[in-house]
Amino acid sequence: MTEYAWHKEIKGWGVATEISLGNRRADCQLRCGKRAEVQARPLPPDEVAGREAHADLWLLDCRAAHRSRRLMVWSDPQFGTLFRWERAWQGFAISKRPVFLNLELDLRTGHGTFLEVTGWTFDGYRATGTGQIHTAASLRSWMRYGLPLAGHQPVAL
């Protein structure tokens, strides 16, 4: 099976790929030393928990959900950036690591948008929550060069 183009692109933003950790591996390592899992499909809760034993954050491909309006993001003057994700990937309800949702990405130009989830709640197949928007360029610079994300607090381990 060939590697999915989105997966290959995103993990290439790190400083190293396919980081071996015992009998598991992380998709990429960031300049700051954190390890990221790059995921293009839903996972069951036990798989999410298992991968979190060796990964520090998640990058999820939510472009199709955003295009089809199953993942809606909007700005609220009182609460900031909010989102609702219909038919959300339920396995991630147990995630304890930071999550970034890829909303848009043009693989030819590198332009795109990510939502850093700052809090979420799952109710069946619906997830609602808060987040912070980042451009693909700023996320890539954070991953590869360690440049801080605008308004970003360091990801705790």
Identify the residue ranges that each predicted region occupies.
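Short beta-strand-initiation
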Residues: 23-25, 96
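Mg2+/Mn2+-dependent nuclease catalytic core
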Residues: 42-72
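Non-catalytic C-terminal interaction segments of nucleic acid-processing enzymes
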Residues: 63-157
